[in-house]
């Protein structure tokens, strides 16, 4: 092999290592939170809980990457996104940021309800909170006490250190 090809392959390997390592994932998470004007600590906690900063994480249900984005959710948030791009950590985080930002706006800037929707699904949450007047500052996690996974999820993100 020629030196130029080896050098190029080596640089590509370094780039892949930099992009896909957990330290870079943490830094990307902080940057995306700032860019999308999200609560940095809560968005950081969300990604930590979802994937433990593993860029190549995939759930049993098919959620992909750092933000554990379902392909159908990605298409809903960014209609023309090729699903394969969810494997790119930055694209995945941007999609997660846009989705949680959408949910926060939908649920009157209430993080606990937005997090429940991120975890359990919008439709499920909409049915659960039907006719509820949402207060921005109120913690609604107890509404989800009968949904142990979502209740625990909200607690982990809102109270993580």
Where are these regions (language model features)?
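N-terminal Sec-pathway targeting helices
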Residues: 1-14
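Catalytic glycan-binding domains that act on GlcNAc-containing polysaccharides
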Residues: 19-161
């Amino acid at each position: 092999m020629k030196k130029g090809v080896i050098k190029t392959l080596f640089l590509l390997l370094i780039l892949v290592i930099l992009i896909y390592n957990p330290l870079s994932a943490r830094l990307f998470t902080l940057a995306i939170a700032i860019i999308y004007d999200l609560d940095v600590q809560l968005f950081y906690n969300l990604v930590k809980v979802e994937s433990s900063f593993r860029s190549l994480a995939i759930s049993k249900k098919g959620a992909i990457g750092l933000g554990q984005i379902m392909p159908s959710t990605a298409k809903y948030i960014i209609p023309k996104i090729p699903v394969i791009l969810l494997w790119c950590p930055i694209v995945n985080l941007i999609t997660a940021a846009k989705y949680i930002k959408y949910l926060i706006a939908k649920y009157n800037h209430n993080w606990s309800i937005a997090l429940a929707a991120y975890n359990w699904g919008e439709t499920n949450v909409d049915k659960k909170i039907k006719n509820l007047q949402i207060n921005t500052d109120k913690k609604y996690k107890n509404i989800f006490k009968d949904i142990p996974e979502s209740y625990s999820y909200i607690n982990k993100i809102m109270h993580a250190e």
